[in-house]
């Protein structure tokens, strides 16, 4: 007998948690069930050690504003990401202010920087600064080529550096470090207190649609072969990170045809020596190597995890065919069907430089990887650093009318035409834009309810519907308010 519920959220990460809280705030009477394959929430990509936790707001990530062919830098994409992050930040602040999250310990003030180290990159960074400084959301950004000034911002990165090496840096004091694992756990704890059912160690075996439009999920208990649970729901969200593609394919919706995925794993060096970690307080992004994918931009980060400061450097790209860190090596081969084979082959052919880059990364020794860290931290001691494996990122491959298939960096909502099912595919910027992504998903799936939700949404997100960059006075008010509530 199927257990009926209004909403099923598959995946115990930041996306499901965010959508769950939004729906519970907007429709308190709806019954919600969250399913997670592992024994707790936030153990895959939302875990603090499986993501960069940058609080992506485009302050330091250079790949969001590349140099155009005309020599001009367009800040539009960076502004869009910054606007999205501020929507998330407002939502989190409201939940803290209303006592719905335990505290604000999931977010910390950590300056964001960009650091580049050759003449061409220094010239680019100057142009980027010139393009950004006139924008409200980037007005406090600083730029310098003065080595002493840069040393004040990031002393470890300048100590021992060649005096003749050109360097330039951007610095934004308003950057943050977000522990998405802690945030997810706080959100789910709130949901549990509101009656949301959480089913752990549950693997989704099958997804079928009934004649009345309801979705039926058959799940198995990963610890007990006899522990079957069947759920029946009128709205299904597939927010299982890299595992969402497999679930989307199981659903059989026509909108999911032609989608494939390319998994990329990430390695980081982690330093937990408090003496070293206390000397660096910034997230510092560099410039990606030629042919490197966007998620491989090198960065040296201050990370605050469970109240302790660490340093992380990476990522180093790797390849494993599983879609989740704790997934199966058969995930990729089993995801290849007749409808996505051609797009995947075409995308693979068009991205040979990426393939060559990944092969080169895979061949690197630990010493070769450490040499990259020394470019950013010249006096780094190998004994202080351990190499860790972060989460899997599954990049989207989709049909393209002109190219046959394209590899897409970013996130994408794939929803049934009637709004009864939605899946979130892709990766970066990911968690930092969870709130606007889930609001957009709700608008797409529940268009008839959107008008009645507007009032509460404006309470949850005070700047809802407003572009902060275009409303300076309102931006000042909202940014000051969220900074105060979140203690950043």
From Swiss-Prot:
GO function terms (MF aspect): 2-hydroxyglutarate dehydrogenase activity; L-malate dehydrogenase (quinone) activity
InterPro entries according to UniProt: FAD/NAD-bd_sf (IPR036188), MQO (IPR006231)
Family: Belongs to the MQO family.
Cofactor dependence: FAD
Gene behind the chain: mqo
Lineage summary: Bacteria, Pseudomonadati, Pseudomonadota, Betaproteobacteria, Neisseriales
EC number of the protein: 1.1.5.4
Entries under NCBIfam families matching the protein: mal_quin_oxido (TIGR01320), PRK05257.1-1 (NF003603), PRK05257.1-4 (NF003605), PRK05257.2-1 (NF003606), PRK05257.2-5 (NF003609), PRK05257.3-1 (NF003610), PRK05257.3-2 (NF003611), PRK13339.1 (NF009875)
Keywords per UniProt: FAD, Flavoprotein, Oxidoreductase, Tricarboxylic acid cycle
Pathway where it operates: Carbohydrate metabolism; tricarboxylic acid cycle; oxaloacetate from (S)-malate (quinone route): step 1/1
Protein name (database record): Probable malate:quinone oxidoreductase
Catalytic activity: (S)-malate + a quinone = a quinol + oxaloacetate
GO terms, biological process: tricarboxylic acid cycle
Pfam families listed in its UniProt record: Mqo
């Amino acid at each position: 007998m199927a257990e009926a519920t209004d909403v099923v959220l598959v995946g115990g990460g930041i996306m499901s948690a965010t959508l769950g809280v939004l729906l519970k705030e907007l429709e308190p009477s709806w019954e919600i069930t969250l399913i997670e394959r592992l024994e707790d929430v936030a153990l895959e990509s939302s875990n603090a050690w499986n993501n960069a936790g940058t609080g992506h707001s485009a302050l330091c990530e250079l790949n969001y504003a590349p140099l155009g062919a005309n020599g001009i830098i367009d800040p539009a994409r960076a502004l869009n990401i910054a606007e999205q992050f501020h929507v998330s930040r407002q939502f989190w602040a409201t939940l803290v202010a209303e006592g719905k999250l335990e505290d604000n310990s999931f977010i910390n003030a950590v300056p964001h920087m960009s650091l580049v180290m050759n003449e061409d990159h220094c010239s680019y960074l100057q142009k980027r600064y010139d393009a950004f400084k006139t924008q409200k959301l980037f007005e406090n950004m600083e730029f310098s080529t003065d080595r002493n000034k840069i040393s004040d911002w990031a002393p470890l990165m300048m100590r021992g550096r060649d005096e003749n090496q050109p360097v330039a840096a951007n610095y934004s004091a308003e950057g943050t470090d977000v522990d998405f694992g802690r945030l997810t756990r706080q959100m789910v704890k709130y949901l549990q207190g509101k009656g949301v059912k959480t089913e752990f160690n549950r693997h989704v075996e099958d997804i079928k649609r009934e004649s009345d439009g309801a979705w039926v999920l058959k799940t198995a208990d990963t610890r007990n072969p006899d522990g079957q649970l069947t759920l029946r729901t009128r709205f299904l969200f597939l927010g299982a990170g890299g595992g969402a593609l497999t679930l989307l394919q199981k659903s059989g919706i026509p909108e999911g045809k032609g989608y494939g995925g390319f998994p990329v794993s990430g390695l980081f060096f982690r330093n937990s020596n408090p003496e070293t970690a206390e000397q660096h307080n910034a997230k510092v992004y560099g410039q990606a190597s030629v042919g490197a994918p966007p998620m491989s931009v090198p960065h040296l980060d201050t990370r605050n995890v469970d109240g302790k400061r660490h340093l992380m450097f990476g990522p180093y790209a790797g390849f494993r065919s599983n879609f989740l860190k704790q997934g199966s090596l058969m995930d990729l081969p089993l995801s290849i069907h007749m409808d996505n084979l051609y797009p995947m082959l075409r995308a693979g052919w068009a991205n040979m430089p990426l393939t060559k880059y990944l092969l080169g990364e895979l061949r690197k020794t630990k010493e070769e990887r450490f040499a990259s860290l020394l470019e950013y931290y010249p006096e780094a001691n190998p004994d202080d650093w351990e190499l860790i494996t972060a989460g899997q990122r599954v990049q989207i491959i989709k049909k393209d009318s002109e190219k046959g298939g394209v590899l897409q960096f970013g996130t994408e909502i794939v929803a049934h035409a009637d709004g009864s099912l939605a899946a979130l595919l892709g990766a970066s910027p990911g968690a930092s834009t969870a709130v606007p992504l889930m609001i957009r998903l709700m608008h797409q799936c529940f268009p008839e309810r959107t008008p009645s939700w507007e009032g509460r949404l404006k309470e949850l997100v005070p700047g809802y519907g407003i572009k902060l960059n275009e409303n300076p006075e309102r931006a000042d008010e909202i940014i000051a308010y969220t900074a105060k509530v979140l203690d950043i």
